[in-house]
Amino acid sequence: MRTVSAPSAVALVVIVAAGLAWTSLASVAPPAPAPGSEETCGTVVRALMPCLPFVQGKEKEPSKGCCSGAKRLDGETKTGLQRVHACECIQTAMKTYSDIDGKLVSEVPKHCGIVDSKLPPIDVNMDCKTLGVVPRQPQLPVSLRHGPVTGPSDPAHKARLERPQIRVPPPAPEKA
């Protein structure tokens, strides 16, 4: 059995955790946690240490321990602040340890059966702070909110802007 140095194990865990943080990027994030409640790099490292041989390319599949830690972190990394923190941990590890393959880190969720994982390639130059931004819902065009758009010379134009139109469809005919 080969032993892994603590610094290498820490790097792996950090990288995998940041990758898992991407899995919840598409969903709307809840409010940021209270200060001090987000995952620490140490917590992430301990959970994902078994993934190190896989992301270094020394094993063809992640171990059961790796998948267990990855699934747990995927479930716990929900807020934008947690995603930003995990990303920054991964970037630090990737800058420190050159033997970690970012492509393999991105494959951990797929190999471990983590559904809806949409991990982009992990890059040491990405702006992690963008992971904390919640996407906005698109606004309806004014024409759909206030009825047809008319020009300023139309007398109904001002009335439409002041009073939104609500159209109710007629009731369906009753069957005899």
UniProtKB/Swiss-Prot annotation:
GO terms for biological process, alphabetical: lipid transport
Keyword Signal carried by entry: yes
Keyword Hydrolase part of the UniProt annotation: no
Compositional bias (Basic and acidic residues): 155-165
Keywords per UniProt: Allergen, Disulfide bond, Lipid-binding, Signal, Transport
Signal peptide: 1-37
Domain of life: Eukaryota
Molecular function via GO: lipid binding
Disulfide pairings: 41-89, 51-66, 67-112, 87-128
Biased composition (Pro residues): 167-176
Region feature (Disordered): 139-176
InterPro entries for this protein: Bifun_inhib/LTP/seed_sf, Bifunc_inhib/LTP/seed_store, Plant_nsLTP
PANTHER family: NON-SPECIFIC LIPID-TRANSFER PROTEIN 2-RELATED (PTHR33076)
Family to which the UniProt record says this protein belongs: Belongs to the plant LTP family.
Role this protein plays: Plant non-specific lipid-transfer proteins transfer phospholipids as well as galactolipids across membranes. May play a role in wax or cutin deposition in the cell walls of expanding epidermal cells and certain secretory tissues.
Protein name, as recorded: Probable non-specific lipid-transfer protein 1
Native source species: Parietaria judaica (Pellitory-of-the-wall)
